[in-house]
Amino acid sequence: MSSHREAPEIAKDPVADSTDLYAFVSPDQPDSVTLIANYIPLEGPAGGPNFYSFGDDVLYEIHVDNDGDGQQDITYQFRFQTRLRDPNTFLYNTGPILSLDSPNWNNRQFYTVTRIRHGQREELAQDLASPPCNIGPLSTPDYAQLAQEAVHHLPGGITVYAGQRAEGFYIDLGSVFDLADLRPFQQLHAKYGMNILNSPAPGVNATAQVNVHSIAIQVPISALVGKNPVLGVWTSASRQRAKVWDAAAGANHWSGPWHQVSRLGNPLVNEVVIPLGQKDLWNTLPPSDEKLFASHYAHPELSALLPALYPGVFPNLAKLAQAGTVRADLEAILLTGIPSGIVPGFQNFTGPVLADMLRLNTSIPPSSKPNELGLIGGDPAGFPNGRRVSDNVFTIELRAFAGVTVPLVDKSFTPDAAAGAVTDGLTSKSVPSGFLGQFPYLGVPYDGYDTP
């Protein structure tokens, strides 16, 4: 949930809250790209009786830019519809759900997939079944099989899944939001004069046993790329502008044109780069308008905070921030992609347009030995070259903001020793569900009986 509840307005609207975005060359199908957009943050597995579902009144989209202008060339739209078998019971299910057409499953959801390519709309599929939430051993005794039934194969080599999955993003939210007292380094924190937190401690994964709702689509690379093998990817959620309460029906009715309320490209951008007063605005704009926020990338608040919160630990970073040096390294990583010639044998440059998008060079094959630190760990198949489900994006970005990537654009700069070591103490092994080696790659969701 690298972008969960990150802005005041979207924090009130979880079904439209885009929490994570992944884009990678499929490790088991290397002629395809997998795109995954997660929504609905911090789902408690035992959250009945209604559990969780996508919003019938939300337009979910995954966008692809294949010519570097920060605007969509291909968009996949997902619209959902909830159908009740029996509106006269409060039960989500009336017995074990053994298949997607089980008569015991009351609160079902179906969806339509539409592709818009260069302005031309094409409905790819309709009435595709989502799986239920993972309730427990009596209600969903073989959830993995139910989820597999919900993997749908469409014409053109496209595969889709839309439903609950285990949260794959790992982060110590408790320490991060407690004035960044990162547990492995908390003894070095300023601590505001308090004589506490005087020894290092292991990180705690705040998302270890929560679920999300994922929209996953696997598409042949040949159906996405243009002249450049690098794709720009982002997701968005939109609502219609007018909401009217129908007292007789006891429900809201939406009408009018669609208005974007959530956006996500690179992880943690709206979370830690964009200031509080601009977060809601940022969510409504396309990536091509990122120039309006360029100063926050050039002079990021977090890079100035780290030396203040950890006195004496980041002296070189402090000098960089005090000098007002433009962080061209962060602009490249997050806004344009990294041009060729900076990292030997690597580039994911889309052009001069500043746009917050995941940038994936589809010509780079999956790694046989993935390193969750991605490019800074010597693995060009990982973040910021797209983003794989196991990539440690918090630590990668934290180290980048701490200055470890400055030498990419300024060979004279020496990162502080701490810049290459700072972390919240978590790794991909901190995810109890683990990850799958095949579509949809995120783990089986935690069930409500065993994970209350």
Name each model feature, range by range:
Residues 1-452:
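Surface-exposed extracytoplasmic segments
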